[in-house]
From Swiss-Prot:
This is Porphobilinogen deaminase. Its cofactor is dipyrromethane. Monomer. One of its GO terms (molecular function) is hydroxymethylbilane synthase activity. It comes from Proteus mirabilis.
Amino acid sequence: MPKSTIRIATRQSPLAMWQALYVKEQLQIAHPSLVVELVPMVTKGDIILDTPLAKVGGKGLFVKELELALLSSRADIAVHSMKDVPIDFPEGLGLVTICEREDPRDAFVSNHYDSLEQLPAGSVVGTSSLRRQCQLKALRPDLIIRDLRGNVGTRLSKLDNGDYDAIILAVAGLKRLKLTERIRSSLSAEQSLPAVGQGAVGIECRLDDHDTQALLAALNHADTATCVKAERAMNTRLEGGCQVPIGSYAIWQNDKIWLRALVGAPDGKTILRGERLVSPEDAEQAGISLAEELLDKGAREILTAVYQGNTAI
């Protein structure tokens, strides 16, 4: 008998709830008689807000509790922002669906300046991401980068209170929360290469739950999945988490996949870059070879220093 109800494990932040409701809506469009319930929960990454993410340690800060709900059958699927999904999954769980990607770029948000270029020397810019930090420091070593934690609303409040001259957020998150007017400019991939999977929503479930996987098939966006899998293959070879200075971005260029990647020292003084243009069937292998190229250039030393806690600005 076909499954009649699906329970979605989700974080409680407004953006996470948007993602879960989006998946609920898409499931009910594809399967009108399906009952979809949300199971909101709090993750470690939501609780520890007074410490930079890179120093909290561990992988899966925003997903572990959701995965426990899957393993204990309190939920059938977990909905994630792909940039938060670790490279490894607990035994019995896996990523089965990747939805169509929203704009993956980073957004420059400020109340007084229209672009990164307009910021005066000494301006304070907020971000919790070492990936954004290293690229900002490389572009503008005269800026002061300060840690910025909390959900999107909290971060915007800190900007509005005058704690920062500008902050960097994901374009996708602002668009999904109907806050597009806060975007003063979008950073190009040359200015700020996006995070692995940025802008895409992924769905995790139990690998033996074939009924649920069959229901999810309608939500998978093949072109997005090809790109994100290439980005994740690179990240896997680098053994990267979601809180390290790694960028990876794949797009379709005619019938090829153009994959770009970087690893940067947090101080921005060293940025290693590489790219590949390959057939879609070779995209994941291209991610692996691109990672090996970056490792040969010195990425291992940069990442080892980060894992040892050397994230000083």
